[in-house]
C-alpha cells in the first residue's frame, strides 16, 4: 500500500512551557539518574560520560492546553474519554465554514450554516473559521462568536457529523452557567476541537484532516497535533 503525502498545513498552536493559559511545565532530569530511581531500572545504573547530552523530562500538562479535543466525558459521566474515543471520528474528510465576519457573542444560525453553500455530509468533520487564532494569547482571546443550538442540532441530528472544530477558544458565550452546545454535541458522541489555527490558510472547503490525542484512560480532553492534507492548488 502506498500512502500519498500531500501538502501539510499545521492546524495546532505552538506551545511554550510556562506561558500558556492552562498548565504546561517541563522538568528536566539526567536520564540515568532518573531511571536509577525507578524499580524497573534501579539495578542497571550506567555511568555515562559527562559530555553526553541524555535527558528525561517530566511533563505537567493541563488537558485543555493549546489546540485540544474535548471528549464526551468532559460533560457526561458515562461519556467516552481520550482512550475510548474512536479515531475514525477524528481522522477523515473535513469541510470549512467561514464565519470570520462574526463578532463577539454573535450567533451563527442554522440558516447561515446552510447559506454557506458548503456541502456537509454524514460523517464529516466540520471546522468553523472565526479568525480568532489571530487574537491567541491576547486580552481579546475569548471574544468569539457562538454557535446557536439550532445550528448545532442541524449538524449533529439532521446531518450526523463526526466532529466539530474551531479556531476560537469555544463556541458558546463565555461565563454562562451551562453549556448546551457542548452537551448536545457530547450526547451525540461528537467531539469538539478548540483553538485550531491557520484555518485561513485553507483554500479548499473540503480536505483531509488528522487529529490525534494521547490514549490516556479517563482523560476528558487532550492536546492534539492537528494537520490538514490538501492538494497542491488548494493551499
How would you describe each model-predicted region?
Residues 1-235:
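Active-/binding-site microenvironments in catalytic and ligand-binding cores
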Amino acid at each position: 500500500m502506498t500512502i500519498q503525502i500531500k501538502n501539510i498545513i499545521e492546524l495546532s498552536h505552538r506551545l511554550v512551557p510556562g506561558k500558556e493559559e492552562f498548565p504546561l511545565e517541563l522538568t528536566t532530569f539526567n536520564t540515568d539518574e532518573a531511571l536509577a530511581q525507578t524499580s524497573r531500572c534501579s539495578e542497571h545504573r550506567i555511568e555515562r560520560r559527562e559530555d553526553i547530552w541524555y535527558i528525561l523530562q517530566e511533563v505537567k500538562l493541563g488537558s485543555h492546553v493549546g489546540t485540544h479535543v474535548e471528549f464526551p466525558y468532559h460533560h457526561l459521566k458515562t461519556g467516552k474519554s481520550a482512550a475510548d474515543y474512536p479515531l475514525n471520528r477524528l481522522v477523515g474528510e473535513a469541510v470549512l465554514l467561514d464565519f470570520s465576519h462574526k463578532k463577539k457573542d454573535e450567533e451563527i444560525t442554522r440558516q447561515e450554516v446552510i447559506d454557506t453553500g458548503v456541502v456537509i455530509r454524514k460523517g464529516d468533520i466540520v471546522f468553523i473559521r472565526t479568525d480568532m487564532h489571530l487574537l491567541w494569547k491576547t486580552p481579546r482571546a475569548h471574544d468569539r462568536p457562538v454557535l446557536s443550538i439550532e445550528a448545532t442540532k442541524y449538524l449533529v441530528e439532521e446531518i450526523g457529523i463526526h466532529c466539530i472544530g474551531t479556531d476560537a477558544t469555544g463556541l458558546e458565550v463565555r461565563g454562562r452557567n451551562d453549556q448546551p452546545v457542548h452537551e448536545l454535541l457530547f450526547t451525540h458522541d461528537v467531539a469538539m476541537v478548540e483553538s485550531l489555527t491557520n484555518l485561513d490558510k485553507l483554500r479548499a472547503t473540503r480536505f483531509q484532516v488528522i487529529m490525534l490525542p494521547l490514549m490516556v484512560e479517563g482523560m476528558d480532553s487532550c492536546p492534539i497535533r492537528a494537520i490538514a492534507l490538501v492538494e497542491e492548488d488548494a493551499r
